[in-house]
Amino acid sequence: NLPSPLHILTGILRAKNVSFSLKIRLLSDMAALQHYARGKRADLAVAQWLRQRNVPRRLVAEFWQPLVWGALNTPLEHASLRILCNVLSDGVWADKPGSDYLLPKRDLGAIIAEPALAKLKQFGADIRLETRVGRLKNLPDGRVVVNDEAFDAVIVATAPYHAVHLFPEDTPDYIQTTYQNLQYHSITTVYLRYAVPVHLPAPLTGLADGTAQWLVYRGALGLPTNEVAAVISVSDYVGAFKSQEWAEKVHADVKRIRPYLDEPEAVRVITEKRATTACMPDSSPPDFAWLHQRRIYPAGDYLHPRYPATLEAAVQSGLTAAERCLSDFGLI
């Protein structure tokens, strides 16, 4: 209940199983990172900055690496320090609520997508789900043709590897090249169902040296108490495993905490191979003026100038594209 930033200071100083000297070192590194964030220094990889600071290996393994993997879904060697600063500055460093960790008890479709669709329908929007869209074309009057229908403008809010195939055929090479050069990282989620309840230490339990980085106690979210979900960010960097291998490794992680468990009764493994774009130093979206002149407005989490590919980035990018479209039509 302490005001910011005392809540962070107190939380770190009260952390268990960490020496006082490491706590002070972490606070010192955080202060140095805040100083970097306020300046206009060149961007660099997080790993490079950590080496420059001679950060102890334990802090790298138990704090910085989980933080960067979870926030940027990019390995330390390639992760942008500037983007990490933006996430911290607008989040945990900004105010006390910014450090509150929220776990939804419903799926994100029910929380975000379905209410958004319902709101659009209130305004008379024509929602067409499961409809394949072909390459966009412009009519002489400037309108955009989508599947033989003409529209005043189009916001392309698809994954980047789909968007590049939707842009007009004469789209400049620099835009197409930017899209083709994007790098991606995977996220793997492993679901395990046991014969008995699995009571983890917290709704979200972190593992610094396991295969899984986070174990989610589904019972705390109103779901069956005998189910555990494990999240592995940058899973392409962790290893190339088959589904059964992922399940076995995560089961071993769970048994470290709850050794009484037998083999799971059921498992499910989902790997999104292109879950997010890599968040690398000095990366920035291309100039979309050519597309804007043709009433085509790209949007997506991968286009945010300050954030990694996150829900926040997706929402803000969509708002920016919509505002630019309305502005070009003189509506705002």
Which sequence ranges carry the predicted segments?
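Mobile amphipathic helical/loop "lid" adjacent to a hydrophobic cofactor/ligand pocket
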Residues: 1-86
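Short, surface-exposed acidic
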Residues: 54-64, 176-179, 259-267
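Mid-domain catalytic core of redox enzymes
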Residues: 131-244, 248, 252-257, 286
